Amino acid sequence: MNSPIKLPKGSITMCGIDDFRDTLEPEHVVVTLCRWQPTWHHSDKNERHHYYFRAHDNDPAIWGHALNLVTDLLEADKDVLIHCVHGRDRTGGVVYMLLKMLDMSHDEVFKVMSEARPSQADEWSDRLYRREARYDKIIEEYINQYRERR
């Protein structure tokens, strides 16, 4: 079962399409990072956002857009449910970078993410380590662009 990561403002919960319905709560604002927008039941009242990009894209601007979207929702004190197909690569990357920007170490981020989404812990133990330098570069670019806009 997936659990929310409580943040200074709002929370973020991760899932994939296979456990989306089991994870979705009425208070969630849904951020979909899949290629196709999900089909919603007429009774679904959740606020929804859709942004697709390839999981292994190295363009900081593309990841930065996803970070902006989620950060804006969290700053508004929303409870965000973020998902992609597996809830691992795009979802994991965005959440990893968000937590790193809160001054958590790699090991702390891995622990928090694995506790929140235990089904991906084995995958993340390797993937997050291999992608750490790339994610750190994206974070640096994101922060620099944020400073330029201020």
What are the roles of these predicted feature ranges?
Residues 1-81, 86, 93-150:
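Cys-dependent protein tyrosine phosphatase-like superfamily
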